[in-house]
């Protein structure tokens, strides 16, 4: 069962690199929060200092004061009417003005800001990520194309990407999909429920069929395909790494893919036949079974709470995080 793997990886933990960090993670990470070593990036040095002085919610956490980019240098930060639309890319106003929320992207100030290429950040070099979470308003490709060994190490990548260029030069979902597949990743989850009304007299009469402008997606590495291509990293995936991968499959509830990987790892001698047998049923993948009955784990919501959760799900990650922080005060 997956519960045994949680014990086996306690000493190594699961390294999660959060580029565009808000300081905390979604509730979906709760079942493994005590295993997570969080490395967050926020260009606000004061906020990083504040976060680093707080007790960690996870196994460990550190926040680094860098604006991550595809290169070292100085770029322009476009400060918009809404802080949640700030970007190192200029808003594509000709396009955005067609939508009801266009005023959120009105540029109020342009400021120079130092940026760092991810492969040049010294403090990150001692880490081998298992998870990369990236929310950077259109800079996914410049950053991930420089991620090198970090992307090689990662099994799980979470992105938030536009289907169209909401910013000038923005990475679009189609471009990201090609890049991720070329690097051995497949999409396993998507939340496209970000529909925005056109800026006309019908904007306050939504039908739920408005245009989808962006989506969060989860990408998992396909070790089976990489092995068939002669690209499987025999040295980079040891017994502990294999068990981390399977725990992440359990967290994502990708039991079928997880079992395919478990069979692959068993053939490679990375898990035992007994461990494989423990994963042959859905119950064997259930992370909630790894906790005592009195220990809370994120549970399904119903009624009004479910409706509220669905409404919050329509908001960008950073805005949701701000609401959660405000409600906790």
Report the location of each language-model feature.
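Phosphate/nucleotide-binding beta-alpha loop and adjacent structural elements of enzyme active sites
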Residues: 1-329
């Amino acid at each position: 069962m997956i519960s045994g793997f949680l014990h086996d990886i306690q000493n190594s933990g699961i390294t999660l690199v959060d580029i565009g960090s808000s300081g905390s993670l979604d509730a979906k990470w709760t079942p493994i929060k005590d295993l997570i070593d969080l490395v967050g990036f926020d260009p606000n040095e004061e906020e990083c200092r504040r976060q680093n002085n707080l007790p960690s919610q996870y196994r460990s956490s550190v926040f680094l004061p860098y604006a991550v980019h595809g290169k070292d240098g100085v770029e322009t930060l476009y400060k918009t009417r809404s802080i949640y639309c700030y970007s190192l890319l200029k808003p594509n106003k000709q396009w955005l003005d067609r939508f009801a929320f266009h005023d959120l992207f009105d540029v109020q100030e342009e400021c120079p800001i130092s940026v760092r290429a991810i492969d040049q950040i010294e403090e990150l070099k001692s880490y081998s990520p298992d998870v990369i979470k990236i929310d950077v308003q259109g800079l996914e490709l410049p950053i991930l194309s420089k991620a090198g060994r970090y992307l090689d190490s990662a099994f799980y990548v979470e992105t938030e990407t536009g289907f169209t260029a909401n910013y000038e030069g923005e990475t679009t979902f189609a471009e990201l999909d090609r890049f991720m597949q070329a690097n051995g990743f497949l999409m396993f989850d998507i939340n496209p429920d970000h529909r925005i009304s056109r800026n006309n007299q019908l904007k306050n009469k939504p039908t739920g069929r408005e245009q989808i402008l962006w989506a969060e997606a989860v990408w998992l590495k396909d070790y089976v395909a990489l092995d068939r291509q002669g690209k499987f990293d025999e040295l980079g995936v040891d017994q502990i790494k294999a068990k981390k991968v399977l725990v992440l499959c359990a967290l994502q509830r990708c039991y079928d893919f997880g079992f395919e990987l478990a069979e692959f790892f068993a053939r490679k001698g990375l898990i035992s036949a007994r461990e494989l047998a423990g994963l042959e049923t859905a119950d064997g993948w259930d992370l909630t079974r790894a906790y005592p009955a009195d220990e809370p784990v994120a549970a399904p919501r119903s009624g009004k709470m479910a409706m509220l959760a669905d409404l919050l799900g329509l908001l960008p990650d950073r805005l949701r995080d701000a609401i959660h922080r405000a409600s906790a005060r």
